[in-house]
Design a protein with these regions (language model features):
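Conserved, mostly hydrophobic/aromatic
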Residues: 3, 45, 66, 100, ...
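Metal- or metallocofactor-binding catalytic centers and their adjacent structured scaffolds
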Residues: 9, 41-111, 330
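Glycine-rich, aromatic-flanked loop segments that form ligand/cofactor-binding clefts
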Residues: 101-137, 171
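Metal-dependent enolase-superfamily TIM-barrel catalytic cores that perform enediolate-based chemistry
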Residues: 126-240
């Protein structure tokens, strides 16, 4: 069976009307959402698919630097594919190579008439615990109402993006806890706190907020500081106010080793589309197990990405692969965020969470 084509397909989903989100640092307007699907075809009409980073740069990398290694080759076991390419091209190719690897594994599984999970030790979970992710910038009361709406679907936790200013960010947590009760987890994706120019929060403010929100039972505080400031992360984690999460902005495996080796985080986040594919995630999760850290899948794309991440997560015990991010969009429920219909149109038969659990 010969590989005939490798296509990084870039797709765009314009919103019917732009959506504007005012926040402490200014205003964010969303005009469209983009996506990438990688398609690999063989001469026997077998096709492998994978989600990829929605980036023209990554698409160019796949076309120019990865495709020449595949065209005309016999379909092969891709277990060493990413590692071999990194050896040849350097760490900068890790993300793109990993995304292509997923499509190769899809093909390899189909060719061998088995689930991809069989190549990673088999399933240890038949469902993956999801958290509902939405919460683009809005008023404190609107955040609370959205949290309640998302948790009506059975999710054990809700993630949102705080950036209303320190006082209103704290008020938001208080109102959300009142809205969802004591048993639902609250996850704060605080990447905006250090991206607001002169209005960015200082380390002292981040430390104050971490202590202040702790009493409300926060599941984790995600990327509250500039991602490369390892010393600041280690200091904040050592205060033991709340669990600190990060990882989505790491560009190679060394970055994850550094996060854990320098004791920067309690929870490591990554996804197959950006972090070395299925083999990369397997290595990251193994690292988490050895460092006694929790792993949580990060997702912010189409419905295809959580399914592929779930393949990987199902091969690990829940004690390690604890959470799967499941974005909530307004085309499913008008009470949340904004619409992204392309997400579901790509994989209309993809499994969806049932009472917060994604069945496989």
């Amino acid at each position: 069976m010969i590989i005939q084509s490798v296509e990084p397909l870039l797709l765009s989903c314009p919103l019917a009307e732009p959506v504007t989100f005012p926040f402490f640092g200014g205003c964010r307007t969303i005009f469209k959402r983009d996506a990438m699907v990688i398609r690999i075809t063989t001469n026997e009409d077998l096709v492998g698919y994978a989600p990829g980073p929605a980036s023209e740069e990554v698409a160019t990398t796949i076309i120019e630097k990865i495709t020449p290694f595949l065209l005309g080759e016999e379909l092969f076991n891709p277990e060493n594919f990413v590692e071999d390419l990194v050896d040849k091209k350097g760490d900068s190719i890790w993300s793109a190579a990993g995304a292509v690897e997923v499509a190769l594994y899809d093909l390899w599984g189909k060719a061998n008439k088995c689930s991809v999970t069989e190549f990673f030790g088999g399933r240890k979970q038949e469902t993956i615990c999801c958290y509902g992710s939405a919460g683009m910038y809005q008023s404190a009361q609107a955040y609370a109402e959205e949290a309640a709406a998302v948790c009506e679907l059975g999710f054990e936790a809700y993630k949102y993006r705080p950036a209303l200013g320190p006082e209103d960010d704290l008020k938001t947590v208080e109102l959300m806890r009142e809205a969802v009760g004591p048993d639902v987890g609250l996850c704060l994706d605080a990447h905006a706190w250090w991206r607001m120019g002169a209005k960015s929060y200082s380390s002292a403010i981040v430390e104050f907020l971490s202590e202040a929100i702790a009493m409300h039972g926060i599941t984790w505080l995600e990327e509250p500081l500039p991602v490369k400031d390892r010393d600041a992360y280690a200091k904040l984690k050592a205060m033991h106010y709340v669990n600190i999460a990060a990882g989505e902005h790491e560009h190679d495996f060394l970055g994850f080793r550094t996060l854990l080796g320098r004791d920067c985080v309690d929870i490591v986040q990554a996804d197959v589309s950006h972090h070395g594919g299925l083999s990369g995630i397997s290595k990251i999760i193994d690292l988490c197990e050895r460092r006694f850290a929790t792993f949580a899948f990060h997702n912010w794309g189409t419905a295809l990405a959580p399914v592929v991440d779930a393949w990987s997560g199902s091969c690990c015990p829940r004690e390690t692969a604890r959470w799967l991010e499941y974005p909530q969009y307004a085309h499913r429920d008008t009470r949340v965020m904004y619409p992204f219909p392309l997400s579901d149109e790509l994989v209309p038969e993809a499994p969806v969470p049932v009472k917060g659990e994604l069945p496989l």
